[in-house]
Regions:
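Hydrophobic anchor at the beta1->P-loop junction of P-loop NTPases
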Residues: 6
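The conserved Walker
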Residues: 10
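Conserved glycine(s) of the Walker
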Residues: 13
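Generic recognition of short, well-ordered alpha-helical segments
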Residues: 16, 43, 107-111
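Hydrophobic positions on the alpha1 helix immediately C-terminal to the Walker A/P-loop
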Residues: 17, 21
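N-terminal phosphate/diphosphate-binding loop that engages ATP/GTP or pyrophosphate donors
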Residues: 23-68
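Phosphate-binding/switch loop-helix module in NTP-utilizing enzymes
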Residues: 65-114
Length: 181
């Protein structure tokens, strides 16, 4: 089992690192990325975007003010599970960007995440820096490589991650004039 997760405070660049890595990989990509958006009223919400079909408008949470975010369990338990199950069947590498606290009560979704982590698929993900039973369960797994992204290492950690993925036999794209080690 090949499971690599990044963790760091918000705004450190974890998702940006994953996007840079995806540009270098020569495999089919599944999974999801959560993006934060503001609607026309200025309200913040969180959208789960599938890497399989690029579809968005899968609202998993809405910021309610006072540092409270209301999870949308229906989206996790339906669209989220669909994204994960389709990815497990149809992709070589699965992105989980990000696993946080909103899905704590989404039992079907958490079960699908466990199935992916137990599979032979390569997983590249982000774990929110938060204390919760599900996040702690993932962190404590023996088959997890957990890398801490900092402002000091974020510019060179991408190459380290690419080397790990290469050692796991993930094919990379080669570019003209690129040296092959």
């Amino acid at each position: 089992m090949y499971n690599l997760f990044l963790t760091a405070p918000s705004g450190t660049g974890k998702s940006t690192i994953i996007e840079k890595i995806l540009c270098r990989l020569n495999v089919s990509i599944g999974g999801f990325q959560v993006k934060r958006y503001l609607n026309k009223k200025g309200e913040m919400y969180f959208d789960m975007i599938s890497f399989m079909d690029k579809k968005s408008n899968n609202i998993i949470g809405e910021y309610m003010g006072n540092k409270k975010t209301l999870p949308n369990l229906y989206t996790f338990e339906n669209k989220g599970v669909e994204i994960l199950n389709t990815s497990l069947t149809n992709s070589d590498l699965i992105i989980l960007d990000e696993i946080g606290f909103l899905e704590e009560k989404a039992e079907k979704f958490k079960s699908s995440v466990r199935n992916i982590l137990n599979s032979d698929k390569v997983v590249l993900g982000v774990l929110k820096e938060f204390d919760s039973p599900f996040l702690n369960e993932i962190r404590s797994r023996k088959d997890i490589t957990l890398l801490n992204v900092t402002l000091k290492n974020r510019d060179y950690i991408t190459n380290h991650i690419l080397n790990i993925l290469s050692s796991w036999n993930i094919p990379m794209k080669l570019y003209e004039n690129e040296m092959i080690p």
